[in-house]
């Protein structure tokens, strides 16, 4: 069982399958996979959940948005982060994003204020900023 805390995040996206491809490319090699699809409460579309391990331990949901693209610093989510175990995993995830043509916001680097905190930032297909990091404490 996972530790108490944030369990899952659902993102409203313009194209669920496109976003699913992005997140599977980014997170698949880290053990994340599509786990389940459910009809939304509207009943006209599906929400797709990805997780690393059991879906009951939390994950990421992708559901159809009602309107256009997210703009960085609009009201809503500014960014969210995925933690990995090693710097090499950060570098590998970054390389996959570069190879896919994703919009990189910041390349991998160590944080100047937090020793051992190593991260990169990328925008998903809808402009939502995603961080992949490791923290060698």
Give the ranges of each region predicted by the language model.
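Vicinal oxygen chelate
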Residues: 2, 6-14, 71-96, 98-137
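Core segments of cupin and vicinal oxygen chelate
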Residues: 10-57
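Short amphipathic alpha-helices in soluble, non-transmembrane regions
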Residues: 22-26, 93-98
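Short, charged helix-to-loop "capping" segments that act as catalytic/coupling loops
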Residues: 27, 37-43, 85-86, 107, ...
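Long, continuous compositionally biased terminal/linker segments
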Residues: 45-85, 92, 99
């Amino acid at each position: 069982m996972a530790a108490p805390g944030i369990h899952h995040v659902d993102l409203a996206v313009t194209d669920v399958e496109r976003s699913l491809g992005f997140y599977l490319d980014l997170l698949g090699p880290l053990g994340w996979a599509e786990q389940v699809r459910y009809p939304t409460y509207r009943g006209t579309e599906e929400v797709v959940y990805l997780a690393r391990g059991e879906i009951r331990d939390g994950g990421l949901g992708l559901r159809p948005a009602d309107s256009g693209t997210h703009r960085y610093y609009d009201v809503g989510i500014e960014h969210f982060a995925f933690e990995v175990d090693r710097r090499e995993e950060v570098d590998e995830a970054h390389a996959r994003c570069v190879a896919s043509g994703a919009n990189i916001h910041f390349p991998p680097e160590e944080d100047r204020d937090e020793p051992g905190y190593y991260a990169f930032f990328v925008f998903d297909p809808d402009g939502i900023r995603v961080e992949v990091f490791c923290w060698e404490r």
